[in-house]
Amino acid sequence: MQQICVLGSTGSIGISTLDVLASHPDKFSVYALTANSSIDLLVEQCLKFSPQYAVIRDEALYLPLKQRIESLNCTTEVLAGEQALCDVASAVQVDSVMAAIVGAAGLAPTLAAVEAGKRVLLANKESLVMSGKLFMQAAKAASALVLPIDSEHNAIFQCLPQPYTSLADAGVQKILLTGSGGPFRDTPLADLSAKTPDQACAHPNWSMGRKISVDSATMMNKGLEFIEACWLFDATPEQIEIVVHPQSIIHSMVQYVDGSVLAQMGNPDMRTPIAHCLDWPRRIDSGVASLDFFALQGLDFCRPDYQRFPALALATSAIKSGGTYPVALNAANEVAVALFLEEKIKFTDIAAIIAAVLEDWETCEPDTIAAVKEADAIARKLAYSVAAKFGY
């Protein structure tokens, strides 16, 4: 019986994870559930899964959550704050940690799980974007098993031989990272500035949280995944090619030196990669319907349009520049997306703000997580300063 800690259980990935776990009560038990501020849903989840701990990141919500839990005669113990997140993620009782907290907020608890040598199901791409070298070094030192949950990286993982050592040893010529192009793939460029948060969050294929939905609309999500893939698979930027695939049926591909291309296919549902990683190397039922090849209308592919998606170009440039450029990229993006979702800036301002932050950025090679966090804080402050010039 695996003991599971779900970091970010009230988010899109967390909810999908619990859906899979509920189907396999003989295999998995929930040790801890965590949320940022969604008390109502967290209470519901505690009543259903009876975890030993429930952690709320916002310490101001500790008492309200504790009172709710106690009033329902639930035996779950309530904790609060970032340190509590790190504690449950690294607890000796825990076998696997689903790292599904969105954004930079997920770095500390995810790293705590890695340093404790856990089996880490990585859905928090920002951990690798911000601290890729340090993160992978920590995983190696602690013998932690990092399994990718992002559908694209999970697809690549499935297409690579195991055990995997390097692209060269595996005979890999190129990784083909696919992306749908989001809801604005065919929108006239002149119309992009008027797009609303609700329009940006209406993804044609995937059901996701609002932040990642906006990232998909700008294709920054693919840019962050590009950086993540470099670290996960020890690849250079030149060894990864982004392919726009509108149907989201092929989740990524690996091209080998002998001319073969292996692709992982399936209906667009995050429960598939979640189930794949939860009991890897064994396969379990995810609850996702099998792909009906006879119902497919076709599979299309094209190159990304960097004029339409300047955020994607900024991301690929950031990993090539190295240092703390990816940290600044991620921080500026989180600030800009939050302002856009609050309707304080235009959709096209997101990439413009990121570009302005990177243009003024003074990079260094961070040798500690503290240095990464310091760079993150500086970049956020700079992003707000830049955003003020856009009317915020």
Swiss-Prot record:
Binding site for NADPH: 10-13, 124, 126, 209
Matching SUPFAM superfamilies: 1-deoxy-D-xylulose-5-phosphate reductoisomerase, C-terminal domain, Glyceraldehyde-3-phosphate dehydrogenase-like, C-terminal domain, NAD(P)-binding Rossmann-fold domains
Cofactor: Mg(2+); Mn(2+)
Record-annotated membrane-spanning stretches: none
Reaction catalysed by this enzyme: 2-C-methyl-D-erythritol 4-phosphate + NADP(+) = 1-deoxy-D-xylulose 5-phosphate + NADPH + H(+)
Record's keyword annotation contains NADP: yes
Record keywords: Isoprene biosynthesis, Manganese, Metal-binding, NADP, Oxidoreductase
Residues where 1-deoxy-D-xylulose 5-phosphate binds: 125, 151-152, 180, 203, 216, 221-222, 225
Family membership: Belongs to the DXR family.
Record protein name field: 1-deoxy-D-xylulose 5-phosphate reductoisomerase
